């Protein structure tokens, strides 16, 4: 049994205990409602997490089913689906708990209404004792005054009549005082009895309320505990499945499902060539005049076998790296010798083909003799694909690969004359100066893949992994390396919008002067870490920019710093280049964009965009908080923005809002105080300002400062220091200051003074407004960094500016 704390502690001289207890009972309804809101928000978070896990499980089904690792995706999918179901079960339990809390809240309201009627008598007793106490105090004071007056008249020797008159008044005051004392005693007894009963009733209500609330909280904690036990079981099951999936079983499963057979090739014995039968089987041969290379009708008799001698094989010589060595024989002679052939001959009966992949050194007679030899070497290397080196090819091997080789042969063998969109070699820092100075444009075929920048000693580019998809050259056509200030896109019918400020250049190499690199369907290529074209083949990261914008709102009342009201809010915006939309839409599961907000100790509240951003409410670090984005929702949102404004080069997405804790006038970067002196003919105004570096984490310059003061009374003339502008139509005075900082005169302190001559005075003091901004800094000191891989932060733009910054006298 709880002690009667309410009965013992809510009396007091002014008898306000009843009012305190009654309002405390009403606050119980607020607590119940807030608890329901808390559980509802938790359910929303769990539901969003469950949906994200479900999407992740579905995306696992779309991953590559090739290779020995493919069966592992089934384990991931099953585990992720179970985790999603666990969180979904928690959502259901929380929703049931919300209904229980709401039901209790309704019962609580009814109970409080009933209690209000029951304690109405106590309220009357409280009012009665408060009234009787005041009346008793007044009667006591009147009684004391009359007695003192009577004694004074006796001592001063007043007339008998005056003394008798004073005695009558004193007796009357005495009777009134005694009457109120008796009434107070009766009222006090009634008040104490009712107040004791009511205080105990209020305590019983609070005990019942707290017991019910604790039961609800216990249900909440048990539900969360059960779900976490299930999650632990899912993780244990995942660990066991991974342990049971051995490397041998994966390899065995791949061999059984993708195996091509267990029969090995048989032995083939050497057979002597019979010249007589070979001559009889030879048919006249004539080559088709318009036959295409590599496309030859096979009509050879199965019994006809040609056994060429060693000389007729004409196997090409190769060097140590697998490249064929060009013979000195003229190719025109070869064509003349084999112009006539059988129309139904097989490719084996044709001339032995010589396929060469050559790196030609610089030669005066070359097609591009004006180019530097180093340029030719680099471009040649950047556009060839090497097969494994072999020493010799048999005729059968040559013919087996004839279709691919003929296609290769059919391509132009001359050096490229134009730089391709994927030629990253051209922007290698080792070769930057020579390539920029070259006057001859370079190109590569459309099939050239992205290559890794090479050193001078590396001649063979490393092969690209086959499992990594290649992006088409137009995937990121909207990503351009043009550093610009962070600002919203501006649409116009006559000019394209400005390009997003995705990065600053990190290299001295310049690519903006090359007109051939800025075609409409060709992404710009560069060595800067800005928004250069991204290829999944070379594991590049996607550029994003972030803006931190804070707004300081303040109201100054006269020169009293205690009356200053301050509110500071902030916004976090992420800017995506327009070309990134194609990357997101072409990839069913783009990398999740995660970011961390640092230095949040001064923030009172953080509100993420619930439709696009998730966070972990269980994070215990008081100075940082991690967030991650719903990439499917972000993709849909960016596509919608793109449809609304397809010409925009980047799109801004609001992800966070926050409020900064303020400490009155100490949190304002510019302190203000106004003084007005109004008369019938003139008005004198003085505005004192003071730069406050303590409001900022790192003191910065306040720029574009404007002060606007409305003045009525029919201003006919204005004298001001520093000079101001008077707008007669708006009846306002305008001051413009270039900038204020610690390095300004008087440490950033000063005054604005003005005298106004009036024709219809006097003026009424009005509220003035101030505007300013500061670039590269925030008041809160909040910072942001990206977490994980897949993205890079090309730019962080920080600024704070005034919202409603007002001053009154």
Swiss-Prot record:
The modification Phosphoserine is found at residues 312, 387, 394, 402-403, 487, 492, 495, 507, 509-510, 532. Residues 301-352, 390-422, 435-536 are annotated as: Disordered. Its main location: membrane. Residues 435-456, 501-520 have a biased composition (Low complexity). It holds the Pfam family GMIP-like_FCH. Ubiquitinated. Mainly undergoes monoubiquitination but also polyubiquitination. It is a peripheral membrane protein. Residues 87-156 form a coiled coil. It is found in: Membrane, Clathrin-coated pit. Residues 3-274 are annotated as: Mediates dimerization and binding to membranes enriched in Pi(4,5)-P2 and induces their tubulation. It comes from the Eukaryota. Changing residue 797 to E: Loss of interaction with EPS15 and ITSN1. The modification Phosphothreonine is found at residue 385. GO terms for cellular component: clathrin-coated pit; clathrin-coated vesicle; plasma membrane; presynapse. Residues 390-416 have a biased composition (Polar residues). Keywords: Coated pit, Coiled coil, Disulfide bond, Endocytosis, Isopeptide bond, Membrane, Phosphoprotein, Ubl conjugation. The keyword Membrane applies. Residues 541-808 form the MHD domain. Residues 520-809 are annotated as: Mediates interaction with DAB2, EPS15, EPS15R and ITSN1. One of its GO terms (biological process) is clathrin-dependent endocytosis. Homodimer; disulfide-linked. May form homotetramer. Interacts with AP2A1. Interacts with EPS15, EPS15R, ITSN1 and ITSN2; recruit those scaffolding proteins which in turn may interact with the adaptor protein complex AP-2 at the plasma membrane. Interacts with DAB2 (via DPF motifs); mediates LDL receptor/LDLR endocytosis. Functions in an early step of clathrin-mediated endocytosis. Has both a membrane binding/bending activity and the ability to recruit proteins essential to the formation of functional clathrin-coated pits. Has a lipid-binding activity with a preference for membranes enriched in phosphatidylserine and phosphoinositides (Pi(4,5) biphosphate) like the plasma membrane. Its membrane-bending activity might be important for the subsequent action of clathrin and adaptors in the formation of clathrin-coated vesicles. This is F-BAR domain only protein 2. The lineage of its organism: Eukaryota, Metazoa, Chordata, Craniata, Vertebrata. The gene is Fcho2.
């Amino acid at each position: 049994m709880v002690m009667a704390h309410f009965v013992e502690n809510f009396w007091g001289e002014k008898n306000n205990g009843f009012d305190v207890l009654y309002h405390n009972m009403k606050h119980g309804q607020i607590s119940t409602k807030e608890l329901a809101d808390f559980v509802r928000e938790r359910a929303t978070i769990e539901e969003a997490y469950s949906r994200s896990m479900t999407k992740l499980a579905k995306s696992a089904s779309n991953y590559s089913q090739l290779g020995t690792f493919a069966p592992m995706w089934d384990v991931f999918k099953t585990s992720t689906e179970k985790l999603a179901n666990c969180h979904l079960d928690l959502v259901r339990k929380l929703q049931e708990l919300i209904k229980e809390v709401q039901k209790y809240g309704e019962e609580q309201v009814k109970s409080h209404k009933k209690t209000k009627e029951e304690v109405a008598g106590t309220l009357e007793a409280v009012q009665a004792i408060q009234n009787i106490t005041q009346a008793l105090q007044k009667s006591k004071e009147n009684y004391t005054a009359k007695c003192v007056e009577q004694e004074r008249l006796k001592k001063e020797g007043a007339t008998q009549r005056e003394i008798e008159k004073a005695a009558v008044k004193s007796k009357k005051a005495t009777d009134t005082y005694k009457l109120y004392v008796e009434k107070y005693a009766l009222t006090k007894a009634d008040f104490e009895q009712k107040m004791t009963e009511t205080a105990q009733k209020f305590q019983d209500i609070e005990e019942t309320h707290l017991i019910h609330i604790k039961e609800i909280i216990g249900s909440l904690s048990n539900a969360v505990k059960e779900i976490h036990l299930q999650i632990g079981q899912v993780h244990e099951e995942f660990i066991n499945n991974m342990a049971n999936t051995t490397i041998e079983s994966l390899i065995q499963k791949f061999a059984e499902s993708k195996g091509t057979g267990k029969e090995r090739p048989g032995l083939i014995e050497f057979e002597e060539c019979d010249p007589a039968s070979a001559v009889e089987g030879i048919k006249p041969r004539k080559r088709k005049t318009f036959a295409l290379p590599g496309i030859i009708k096979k009509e050879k008799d199965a019994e006809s076998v040609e056994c060429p001698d060693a000389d007729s094989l004409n196997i090409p010589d190769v060097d140590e790296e697998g490249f064929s060595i060009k013979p000195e024989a003229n190719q025109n002679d070869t064509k003349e010798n084999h112009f006539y052939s059988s129309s139904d001959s097989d490719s084996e009966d044709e001339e032995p083909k010589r396929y060469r992949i050559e790196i030609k050194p610089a030669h005066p007679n070359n097609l591009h003799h004006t180019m530097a030899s180093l340029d030719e070497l680099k471009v040649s290397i950047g556009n060839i694909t090497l097969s494994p080196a072999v020493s010799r090819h048999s005729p059968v091997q040559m013919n087996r690969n004839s279709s691919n080789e003929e296609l290769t042969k059919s391509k132009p063998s001359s050096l490229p004359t134009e730089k391709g969109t994927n030629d990253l070699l051209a922007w290698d820092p080792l070769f930057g100066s020579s390539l920029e100075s070259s006057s001859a444009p370079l190109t590569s075929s459309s099939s050239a893949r992205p290559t890794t920048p090479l050193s001078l000693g590396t001649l063979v580019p490393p092969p690209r992994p086959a499992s990594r998809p290649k992006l088409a050259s137009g995937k990121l056509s909207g990503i351009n390396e043009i550093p610009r200030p962070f600002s919203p896109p501006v649409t116009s019918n006559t000019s394209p919008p400005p390009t997003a400020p995705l990065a600053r250049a990190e290299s001295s190499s310049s690519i903006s002067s090359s007109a051939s690199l800025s075609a409409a369907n060709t992404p710009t290529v560069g060595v800067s870490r800005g928004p250069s074209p991204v290829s999944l083949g070379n594991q590049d990261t996607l550029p994003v920019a972030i803006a931190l914008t804070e707004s300081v709102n303040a109201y100054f009342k006269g020169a009293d710093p205690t009356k200053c009201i301050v509110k500071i809010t902030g916004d976090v915006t992420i800017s995506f280049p327009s070309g990134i939309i194609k990357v997101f839409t072409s990839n069913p599961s783009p990398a999740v964009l995660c970011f961390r907000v640092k230095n949040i100790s001064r923030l009172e509240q953080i509100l993420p965009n619930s439709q696009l951003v998730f966070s972990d409410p269980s994070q215990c670090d008081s100075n940082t908080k991690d967030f991650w984005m719903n990439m499917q929702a972000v993709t849909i949102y960016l596509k919608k923005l793109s449809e609304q404004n397809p010409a925009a080069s980047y799109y801004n997405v609001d992800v966070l809002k926050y409020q900064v804790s303020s400490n009155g006038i100490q949190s304002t970067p510019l302190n203000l105080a106004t003084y007005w002196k109004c008369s019938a003919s003139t008005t004198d105004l003085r505005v004192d300002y003071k730069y406050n570096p303590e409001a900022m984490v790192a003191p910065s310059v306040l720029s574009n400062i404007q002060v606007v003061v409305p003045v009525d009374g029919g201003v006919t003339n204005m004298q001001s220091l520093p000079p101001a502008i008077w707008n007669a139509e708006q009846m306002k005075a305008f001051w413009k200051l270039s900038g204020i900082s610690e390095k300004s005169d008087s440490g950033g302190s000063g005054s604005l003074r003005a005298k106004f001559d009036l024709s219809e005075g006097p003026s009424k003091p009005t509220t003035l407004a101030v505007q300013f901004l500061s670039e590269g800094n925030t008041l809160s000191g909040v910072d942001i960094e990206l977490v994980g891989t897949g993205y890079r932060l090309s730019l962080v733009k920080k600024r704070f500016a005034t919202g409603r910054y007002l001053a009154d006298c």
